[in-house]
Amino acid sequence: TIMSFFYVFFFGMMLSDAAYGAVVAIVCAILVKKYPRMSQSMAKSLKLFFYCGVSTLVWGVLFGGYFGNIVDIVSEKFFGHTVTVPALWFVPLNDPMKLLVYSLLFGTIHLFVGLGIKGYLCLKDGKVVDFICDVVLWFVMLIGLILMLLPSDIFASIAQTTIVFPAALNTAAKVMAAGGAIGIVLMSGRANKNPALRLALGAYDLYNVTGWLSDALSYSRLLALGLATGVIASVINQMGAMLPNNVIGVILFIVIFIVGHVLNLAINLLGAYVHTNRLQFVEFFGKFYEGGGKAFEPFKENTKYVDVKEETTL
């Protein structure tokens, strides 16, 4: 499903170490194979985390992370020359701003998919007007704003690259942003017959564009957790590398390696789990999900009039 794809995608990006991913995938596969009679919910969870482990392995290969930089440390400390396993894409520690840009890009795609699901639900229920006013107009305005942002100096300073659009595209972006904003102001309060209140509700709904900005920036946690995994792993390896090259040093190196990486894996597994859930249930679901059910009505006796009888005791 769409949700599981993004869950696995973001989980792997946050953990982003090939060795950690292999460990998670292997452990989950062994548990599923060894305990076939486990509950269905537990089996589904382990299968999900198996795919999360595979995703982590893929992201780790792309970023060149294998227990942090253990290959570099071991080759230099014990063999006298440095051997580096190159990243297939880039190393986040060397180019964090690039990872930030891609994190925001993936987050924007995730949010747009959520808005698209809202449009699908509107069309499914036959709400064509709602589809146009609550989905299409937002798409038009947001795409226009993004096209205005890309050639700006702000984006150039973050992405460390300059994008130049033709004048016609810049004009079209401004028209899309302005047209979408005007449409939202005029149509968001369409259920209200009072023109002034209708415009006020439309302006309030337009203010929700700041919510879109905060939701998009929330995906910067992909950068933060991805860097945290690699930095902590590298620190653990460096601590082991500070020991002398003798038998005791090797034994302590192995102990530090095992204990340190087990703790790092546990902490970052928890972090990836929590923050991936947050991106799904807060940012993603917030674009289309509407709670159902009925309003709570407590069990009570509803009366309009109350007769009070006064009892007198002699």
Give names to the regions the model predicted:
Residues 1-314:
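Conserved, carboxylate-rich catalytic/transport cores that coordinate ions
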